[in-house]
């Protein structure tokens, strides 16, 4: 399984610190650092996913659907990621990155409804095949580092990796009326492979 390079750097740094602690204080005192290093490798895992075909949108993140509701003429789907979920993010549709907007904010617990508007976040607009979808990478109480690897003008494939949020977070996806959301609150979804919406104006 792939590991995001950031996780490897963290793990190596922790192992170096563990070696120093073991030398200065004894091996038992190094065990907590070794365990944290192993968790970093687990947290930053990046499994391959089977991307579905058809006029669909896929989940941009692993996690639990916590909300599906109208918002400003659009439909908002919210996904909460706990610290044990894969945190590599993927684009929900194929298209071109139109806009990337960084918004400063708070670091409320990502499962809370108000974090969709109040927390620090990246707001990304993707347009393709006659539709526009907006998704938000939202920082949480623990996650305070949002990584986005694309730029406006970049083309992205359905389910392509586009970044990550470190340590517990949330992702929102905003769909227009041409989309039908196919998941409900309480469902678990996987980034890149779980279908979360279908085009109403396109045949499968």
Swiss-Prot record:
Residues modified as Pyruvic acid (Ser): 169
Domain of life (superkingdom): Bacteria
Keyword terms of this UniProt record: Cell membrane, Decarboxylase, Lipid biosynthesis, Lipid metabolism, Lyase, Membrane, Phospholipid biosynthesis, Phospholipid metabolism, Pyruvate, Zymogen
Topology relative to the membrane: Peripheral membrane protein
Modification after translation (UniProt): Is synthesized initially as an inactive proenzyme. Formation of the active enzyme involves a self-maturation process in which the active site pyruvoyl group is generated from an internal serine residue via an autocatalytic post-translational modification. Two non-identical subunits are generated from the proenzyme in this reaction, and the pyruvate is formed at the N-terminus of the alpha chain, which is derived from the carboxyl end of the proenzyme.
Disulfide bond positions: none
Entry GO MF terms: phosphatidylserine decarboxylase activity
Cofactors demanded by this protein: pyruvate
EC number per UniProt: 4.1.1.65
Cofactor note: Binds 1 pyruvoyl group covalently per subunit.
Reaction catalysis annotation: a 1,2-diacyl-sn-glycero-3-phospho-L-serine + H(+) = a 1,2-diacyl-sn-glycero-3-phosphoethanolamine + CO2
Cellular compartment(s): Cell membrane
Signal peptide: none
Active site as annotated: 169 (schiff-base intermediate with substrate)
Main location: membrane
Site (Cleavage (non-hydrolytic)): 168-169
GO biological process: phosphatidylethanolamine biosynthetic process
First-level EC class: lyase
Pathway: Phospholipid metabolism; phosphatidylethanolamine biosynthesis; phosphatidylethanolamine from CDP-diacylglycerol: step 2/2
A single cellular component GO annotation: plasma membrane
Subunit structure as annotated in this protein's UniProt entry: Heterodimer of a large membrane-associated beta subunit and a small pyruvoyl-containing alpha subunit.
Annotated PANTHER family: ARCHAETIDYLSERINE DECARBOXYLASE PROENZYME-RELATED
Function (record text): Catalyzes the formation of phosphatidylethanolamine (PtdEtn) from phosphatidylserine (PtdSer).
Family of this protein: Belongs to the phosphatidylserine decarboxylase family. PSD-A subfamily.
Name of the protein this chain belongs to: Phosphatidylserine decarboxylase proenzyme
Native source organism of the sequence: Solibacter usitatus (strain Ellin6076)
Gene: psd
């Amino acid at each position: 399984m792939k590991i995001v390079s950031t996780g490897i750097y963290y793990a190596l740094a922790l192992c170096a610190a563990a070696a120093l602690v073991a030398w200065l204080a004894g091996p038992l005192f190094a065990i907590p650092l070794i365990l944290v290093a192993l968790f970093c490798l687990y947290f930053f895992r990046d499994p391959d996913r089977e991307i579905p075909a058809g006029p669909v949108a896929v989940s941009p993140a692993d996690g639990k659907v916590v909300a599906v509701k109208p918002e400003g003429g659009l439909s908002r789907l919210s996904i909460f990621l706990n610290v044990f979920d894969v945190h590599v993010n993927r684009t929900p549709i194929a298209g071109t990155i139109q806009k990337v907007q960084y918004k400063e904010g708070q670091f409320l617990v990502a499962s809370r409804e108000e974090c969709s508007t109040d927390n620090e976040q990246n707001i990304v607009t993707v347009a393709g095949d006659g539709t526009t979808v907006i998704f938000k990478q939202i920082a949480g109480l623990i996650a305070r580092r949002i990584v986005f690897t694309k730029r406006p003008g970049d083309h992205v494939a359905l389910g392509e990796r586009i970044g990550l949020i470190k340590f517990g977070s949330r992702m929102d996806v905003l769909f227009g009326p041409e989309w039908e959301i196919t998941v409900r609150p309480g469902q678990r979804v996987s980034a890149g492979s779980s279908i979360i919406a279908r085009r109403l104006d396109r045949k499968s």
